[in-house]
Each structure stands twice: as C-alpha cells, then as structure tokens.
Design a protein with these regions (language model features):
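N-terminal auxiliary segments of SAM/dcSAM-dependent transferases
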Residues: 30, 52, 93-165
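Conserved AdoMet
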Residues: 50-107
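Generic hydrophobic, helix-prone segments enriched in Leu/Val/Ile
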Residues: 1-3, 69, 89-93, 102, ...
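Charged, low-complexity, helix/coiled-coil-prone segments
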Residues: 65-84, 135-148, 192, 243-257
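Class I S-adenosyl-L-methionine-dependent methyltransferase catalytic core
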Residues: 1-62, 121-125, 151-154, 161-302
Length: 302
C-alpha cells in the first residue's frame, strides 16, 4: 500500500443515481429480473443497457449483493463528449458529475486515489502514453483531489471507446463493500469467474433439485459447486479434480463460504461411487495445449 493513503468511507448517495450492473450481454434479462426483485421502495427504474442493466435507485447497496453481474459502474455524465486526445479527455471528465459522485457518497474529503483503464483498439504504447498524460492532467485540473495511484487505488475510471469516436466514461468505486464472493480466496488460471458461475446456475435453476446429490467432476477451486448450493441448497456435494493445488484451494474456499463439500484429488475417470448422482454441474476443461484429437478423446470418454 502506498504510504499516506486515506481510505474513504462509502455512506451512500443523498439523491437517486444511475448505475450499471455490467453483465453477460446475452443474459442481461437474468440480471434484470434479479434487479426487479429488489424492494420497489428502493428502485426508481431499470432497463437493459448494451453492457448490462442500467438502474436508477436511491441506494446502491441492496443491488450490490446480486450475484449475476460482473461489475457495478456509475456513468460519468460529461458536459461535452469525451474526445480521443488525452488532455481533452481529462478536461471533459473533470467537467462532469464526477466530483459530485465522489463527495456525495463518501464521508471523508481527502484526495481520492485512482486508476485509469482504457478499453480501446489503441496500440499498447499509445495507450500507455494516453493514460500517463490523461492522469497527470486530471490531477492538475482537480487540484490533486484525484491522485493517480495505479497500484493502490480506491476508484477506477473506465474509458470505453465508442463506435462513433471518443469515449464513454464510467466510475468504479472500490469503497462499496462487496461481500458476494468473499469466500473465493483461492483461484487457479483455469478458474471460472464467480459471477459467470452464478449466472450459469441462475439459468439452470428451473432444472435444479433441492436436497440433490451433486457431482462436479472437474471442480477446480469449487466455485461452481458453491454457487450451485447458494442458489438451491443441496444435500451431498462432491468435487473431483486431478490438480492438487486446486483441491486445496477448493477446501479453503468452501470453508470460507460455510459449505460442506467433499473434495477429492483424483482423476475423474478413476472415480467410482456407491450411488448415482442427481446432477452433474461443471466447468469443462478447455483445450489449452492439448491437440484437437486429445480433446475429442477426452470429451468422448466423458
């Protein structure tokens, strides 16, 4: 952590705000239905957005616990379009509702440490130059109310390239407590994102059986099984993986989640059990370094 950084306390907004629950483009309807399940006393409106679900509400926190979105972002409303040059973009972003969003939502008035992320087709070297110039100019314009700290930050500014040129700007607040996936202390390279696992389970919910006996033959760090049990409680849960490090991580994750799951470090094809399972739920291994023939053989055996 950078020395002297003062953490800010999120206290909520005094006025209703727009915020985006970014999610899988093809499954936005699932998240929309979960938004509609939040008390109408909090919600003002909600609608589909190209990146997810756009919500207008007086308190963001009841929505933060929804499991099927990837990120919670606030649209930064600029007075002028955000241009493609770094200095002009910084000026446009500062001439917006950004300062109001930050000061209204936090108790402390100390500087906010930020990181800039640019989603564009710009070459990496030009993107780095843009980020450096943008960040320095935003620091200057804000009188160092905003301080560039890419390795230890509380807020993230996201610039998304628009089809018609320029950028759309979003704000991500790391000051909002997100306990949804706090159990996931361990992951490996092939691990599924927990929000993706939650989305898959939400889509499968009509077919899930309460108190079922479930098997994940390629369980990794246990994310699919944990999310399955959170959505619809199961009776017996078994996770198998040939990768010992993943199984160790899965046991820890399940413990953090308060889940009782039987994890076995073994090749699925060598596994036998005394009774049949009601469900198999898994994130199947991808091809990776295997040849197409090896992958076809693997899936054929499965």
């Amino acid at each position: 952590a950078a020395e002297g950084i003062t953490r800010h306390t999120f206290v909520g907004f005094t006025e209703p705000q727009d915020f985006l629950l970014a999610t899988n483009r093809e499954q936005r309807g699932v998240t929309l239905e979960e938004v509609k399940a939040v008390s109408a006393s909090v919600r003002r409106s909600e609608k589909l957005h190209p990146l997810g679900v756009l919500v207008h509400a007086k308190d963001v926190r009841p929505f933060a616990s929804i499991r099927t979105y990837r990120e919670l972002l606030f649209p930064v409303r600029t007075a002028q379009p955000v241009p493609e040059d770094a200095l002009g973009a910084a000026e446009a972003v500062w001439d917006s509702n950004l300062r109001e969003l930050l000061t209204q939502a936090h108790r402390e008035t100390t500087p906010f440490y930020f990181r800039l992320e640019i989603k564009s087709h710009m070459p990496l070297d030009k993107k780095s130059t843009f980020a450096r110039r943008f960040s320095a100019e935003l620091e200057r314009l804000s009188g160092r109310m905003l301080v560039n700290a890419p390795s230890d930050y509380e807020i993230e500014l996201r610039l998304l390239e628009k089809r018609d040129g320029g950028y759309a700007c979003f704000l991500k607040l790391l000051t909002i407590a997100h306990g949804r996936f706090a159990y996931r202390k361990n992951a490996v390279a092939a691990s599924i994102h927990p929000a993706t696992a939650a989305m898959i389970v939400a889509l499968a919910e009509p077919y899930l059986k309460e108190n079922a006996q479930i098997l994940d033959p390629f369980c990794g760090v246990g994310t699919m099984l944990i999310e399955r049990d959170i959505r619809v409680p199961a009776r017996e849960k078994y996770g198998i993986d040939i990768f010992g490090e993943a199984i160790r991580g899965a046991r820890e994750n399940a413990s953090y989640a308060g889940e009782k799951i039987n994890f076995i470090n073994r090749d699925y094809f060598d596994f036998t059990h005394a009774y049949l399972f009601d469900e198999i739920i898994t994130n199947m291994p991808v091809r990776g370094r295997k040849s197409k023939e090896e992958t076809d053989t693997f899936y054929g055996r499965f």
